[in-house]
Amino acid sequence: YVPEDRRVFTDLSVMENLETGQKAGADGAVIWTASKVFDLFPEIARRRDATAGTLSGGERQMLAIARALMGNPCILLLDEPSEGLAPVVVQRLGETLSALALEGLTLLLAEQNKALARRLANNVVILETGHVVFTGTFDDLDRMPELLQRYLGV
């Protein structure tokens, strides 16, 4: 799980943050190691000994995702991963999440950035106060301008 507010341990180093998330997957497999997440996120690899409190918002988001991957999940839950990030960082994040999906990792995304969500999602579900008000594809959603306006403001 990657929470909305990029919860990282600010007094720990990048490497120590990763170690706090390390565990085998449900099937006992260890797919994600520090070396593999550093390959995925070279930006934080260069700062492996820096305390997380010195990282930028984008670097903290990368660290939060990397730490979640260290738990070797079969599903990665992401709550508003693009919130508060610069467009160039959102672009990089989208590329990384797309690569993870192509590797076969299931992503469950709560995201208001329609462009990022469209890039990553096979299916769309819109909830209102816990009730499903729409389920379908982005193409289906595009044919429903009233839903786009009401829930996405477009």
Label each PLM-derived region with a short phrase.
Residues 68-69:
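ABC ATPase C-loop
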Residues 14-32, 40-45, 49, 152-154:
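ABC-type ATPase nucleotide-binding domains, specifically the catalytic core motifs of the NBD
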Residues 91-103:
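Helical segment within the ABC ATPase nucleotide-binding domain
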Residues 72:
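Conserved catalytic motifs of ABC-family nucleotide-binding domains
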Residues 51-55:
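Conserved ABC ATPase signature
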Residues 76-80:
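Catalytic Walker B motif of ABC-type/P-loop ATPase nucleotide-binding domains
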Residues 109-112:
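H-loop/switch region of ABC-family ATPase nucleotide-binding domains
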